């Protein structure tokens, strides 16, 4: 299994093609979850079970992703950190683009 982001009720080509891979379930448990627990994060903690994200939620999620990156610098190997950073950057960039419709909902899980 893997964790990714998709848009619900896709209404155009952009939304049809919106798919952001975040992590395999095992990588999430091994590398993301320790950061989430150590930092007491709320939004990213819901990624493994699944969460609906609206446009107003994006700044909070991006802030948590920044905190995870800072934690990873001190706690992960370079290889794992690079892998995580690549996916976080892609997620951050795509979340900023996802809400071309005000009522769009992104599912992360």
Each language-model region and where it sits:
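Acidic (Asp/Glu-rich) sequence patches and key acidic residues
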Residues: 1-109
């Amino acid at each position: 299994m893997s964790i990714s982001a998709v848009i619900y009720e896709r209404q155009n080509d952009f939304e049809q093609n919106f798919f952001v891979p975040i992590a395999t379930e095992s990588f999430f448990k091994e590398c993301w979850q320790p950061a989430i627990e150590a930092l007491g994060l709320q939004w990213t903690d819901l990624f493994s079970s699944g969460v609906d994200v609206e446009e107003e939620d994006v700044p909070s999620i991006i802030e948590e992703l920044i905190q995870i990156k800072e934690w990873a610098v001190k706690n992960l190997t370079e290889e794992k950190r690079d892998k995580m950073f690549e996916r976080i950057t892609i997620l951050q960039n795509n979340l900023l683009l996802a809400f071309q419709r005000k009522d769009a909902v992104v599912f992360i899980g």
